[in-house]
């Protein structure tokens, strides 16, 4: 029997702090401090090595080490690990290796195969093959702006046929896809686009994975709670105050502005790995 994760609440897709030297080594001490701070703000869980975590610029060994540090600092809160790749058997082996190295990992956030632009049938096959190999539940990550391919509504429902595929992080900006997931009821819907957070939560998303919640974390947690308590007017008022935060966070390619803001607060250096560049002064 496959255990089902509880995805309710505000999840943080973590930045990966780096030392401000040419090597840009991962700053594990800063990461641990940041995770402990964010956990105390009431977040439901974390995502390590997602797009906000600059996973594409980290080696496999670095990613595994980031996961270890995050788990150790999370205080028992669940941690999802970002996962991507084109060859399903290799991605499945990576999931197995990560779970063996870090048994406390709660699950994996898996993108559609990037760059190759497979058919929808190919996407289903890819996810099901990885799910069959994975020892942990999967969250399908629909982010066509990065992968170059949509996970269509019918495809999402086909993914739900596998018991290890339990949720979708929706960055598609397609209300029809979200509505299909909600009507079907087998996948938990997680809001993925920060600028659509209020709308997605109000329409029934059980939780959110929100990068801009590195900033004003407690307020973002409060927003989710207000909507869970059906206090829509209070949520709308709070959202009006949070919208400038989300707009600023994505004024440049993610996560450079978030890192700059956290650096100003003393949590980490604003270092990113090329081809990313530090935030401009105007941001």
Residue ranges: model-predicted function:
Residues 6-19, 37, 41-43, 202-205, ...:
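C-terminal alpha-helical cap/extension of soluble enzyme domains
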Residues 8, 44, 49-52, 81-84, ...:
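Short glycine-rich loop/turn motifs that provide flexible caps or phosphate-binding loops at active sites
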Residues 42, 102-104, 163, 185, ...:
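Glycine-centered loop/turn motif at secondary-structure junctions
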